[in-house]
Each structure stands twice: as structure tokens, then as C-alpha cells.
UniProtKB/Swiss-Prot annotation:
Residue stretches spanning the membrane: 7-27, 54-74, 80-100, 116-136, 141-161, 163-183
Domain of life according to the entry: Bacteria
Protein encoded by which gene: plsY
Membrane topology classification: Multi-pass membrane protein
Pfam families for this protein: G3P_acyltransf
Name of the protein in its database record: Glycerol-3-phosphate acyltransferase
GO CC list: plasma membrane
Compartment list: Cell inner membrane
Reaction equations catalysed: an acyl phosphate + sn-glycerol 3-phosphate = a 1-acyl-sn-glycero-3-phosphate + phosphate
Family of this protein: Belongs to the PlsY family.
Length: 205
């Protein structure tokens, strides 16, 4: 693009699309409890999985991963350089983490980062997804899987999509920052697992 205005518009559009939290909208549509008010209070895939099960969690993952794709498709159609595509992708992640609405209470940006990587560095996205799935299965803890995938992403990018390594590193840094509290809880042994929470039944009279 020759003018900075369309680039600014794409970044703004990315932030606004990122601000649409999949967990909130999916749970509202299905009549489920708002994940910001239960469990870990994080509006993301893992908390929805613990609270409401596989189907709402899968829908949340799909929405959060897909919301970056339209604006990045436009950026690629306009032949923006990789750093500019990265800026647009980052705006989606910032929107998800610090949304315009929902009182600024966003998610950890893992699913959204997966969607951004699918558009910018597709092989890296799949390597990180595989890493996440294996570690989530072994550790039963989403934070462990997410932290490992975030640390792996720049290395995988250097190997598979070297031109995107810098922007992928920025994405990873944001995900790590968003997991600061999880890192503390892991150190204290208090990080919740991925197992669905059991509903407490009222005592029988």
C-alpha cells in the first residue's frame, strides 16, 4: 500500500476483530455461564473446556483462531511486507488480550496466535499446535503446553519461515507476558488442569 491510511485501517480492524472474544460469544449463544465469572475466569479455550466441555471449547477455539484471518487475507492481498502483516496480526492479539469492550478483560491469545500464524507462517502454526497438543495430553495443563509452544515458535520460524522470525518472536513475547500469572501458579503448584470441573450436587435430604 502506498498510503499509511489503509495500513492504519487494517491495524484498527485487526484490533476490533481481536476484541471479539470467542469464549464470551460462544457461551452466550449456547446459554452457558460466562467463563469470565467462573473457573480461572479467563475467556479462553482451556477455561471453557473445564467449565462446559469439548463442544463449546472447540467452537471457542475456532472463533478465536478464525477472527484474524479476514484482515490478514486483505493484508496479503495488498502484498504488504511481512513486518506489516505482523503488525496487523499483532493488533489482533492485542485486541484479544486487551479488548475494547468486556472491560478490557481479555484472554491469553494462544488460539488467536495460532490463527495469525496459520496466515503468516503456516508450518510454524502446525508445529506449535502439535507441540501444544502433545504437552497438553502429557501434562494435562494448558499453561505448560502454551508456554512451551510460545517458546518453540521463534525457533520453528527460524527453521521453517525465517523471514517471519522477528514477528513470530513478538507474538511469542506477548503470549508469555499474558501467562505471567500462570507461571507464578505453576511455581506454586496451583495451576488448574484441563479436566472438566465436576458440578457440585446439592445434598440429598
Amino acid at each position: 500500500m502506498s498510503s499509511p491510511l489503509p495500513m492504519t485501517a487494517l491495524v484498527l480492524a485487526g484490533y476490533l476483530s481481536g476484541s471479539l472474544l470467542g469464549a464470551v460469544w460462544v457461551c452466550r449463544a449456547l446459554g452457558r455461564r460466562d467463563p469470565r465469572h467462573a473457573g480461572s475466569r479467563n475467556p479462553g479455550f482451556s477455561n471453557v473446556l473445564r467449565l462446559h466441555g469439548v463442544v463449546p471449547a472447540a467452537l471457542t477455539l475456532g472463533v478465536d483462531a478464525a477472527k484474524a484471518m479476514p484482515v490478514l487475507w486483505v493484508a496479503q492481498r495488498e502484498a504488504l511486507p511481512i513486518w506489516a502483516q505482523g503488525a496487523v496480526g499483532l493488533s489482533v492479539l492485542v485486541g484479544h488480550s486487551y479488548p475494547l469492550w468486556h472491560r478490557g478483560r481479555g484472554g491469553k491469545a494462544v488460539a488467536s496466535a495460532f490463527g495469525v500464524l496459520l496466515m503468516i507462517a503456516t508450518p510454524v502454526a502446525w508445529v506449535c499446535a502439535l507441540c501444544w497438543a502433545l504437552l497438553a495430553w502429557r501434562s494435562r495443563t494448558a499453561a505448560v503446553a502454551s508456554l512451551a509452544a510460545a517458546l518453540l515458535a521463534p525457533l520453528a520460524s527460524y527453521w521453517l519461515a525465517r523471514e517471519a522470525t522477528l514477528v513470530v518472536s513478538v507474538f511469542s513475547a506477548l503470549v508469555l507476558v499474558r501467562h505471567a500469572w500462570n507461571i507464578r501458579r505453576l511455581g506454586q503448584g496451583g495451576e488448574p488442569g484441563l479436566k472438566r470441573e465436576e458440578r457440585i450436587k446439592p445434598p440429598e435430604e
